Amino acid sequence: MEKIVVGIDGSEASKNALRWAVEDARVRGAEVIALHAYEEPMPALDAGPATPLDLPGLVTEFYEGALRLVSDVVDEVVGNAVTVNVAPIAVEETPTKALLDASRDADLLVVGSHGHGLSGLLLGSVSLECAQHAACPVLIHRGSTSQ
């Protein structure tokens, strides 16, 4: 079965990309992986007294929050439609690295374009990095699903 990986960050652009991917997967008989990458913030260490941190608890909390975000997006976009298997996945990694890693096992990588124009390109957008370095074809979805 073909696999389509979609980058999810909670934005309208990523929701529209997921809508497109789900419809494409329905036509092609593919499965969809909705992938959200997150980075855990590093606690600031200073010289003053501090409350002990529950690092394992924080790790779990960040993961659960990330998984909740991508699951909520999948629920919003797909709803109760059972025609396509959509798996929400959260990974601790930078978005670019997570998507590039996932592209190695995918038939298509779909990312939304936030439309930042030239400034986004100069700063190195995730979409641009994926288009240049992914191991599979990349579709950069611009605009709404009707476009």
What feature does the model see in each segment?
Residues 2-56, 85, 102, 133:
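Small/aliphatic-rich secondary-structure junction motif
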Residues 9, 74, 114:
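Short glycine-/small-residue-rich Rossmann-like dinucleotide-binding loops
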Residues 33-35, 87-91, 139-141:
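General small-molecule cofactor/ligand-binding pocket signal
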Residues 36, 112-114, 142-143:
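Short secondary-structure boundary segments
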Residues 53-68:
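A short acidic, glycine-rich active-site loop
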Residues 133-143:
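Short, acidic/small-residue loops that bind anionic groups at enzyme active sites
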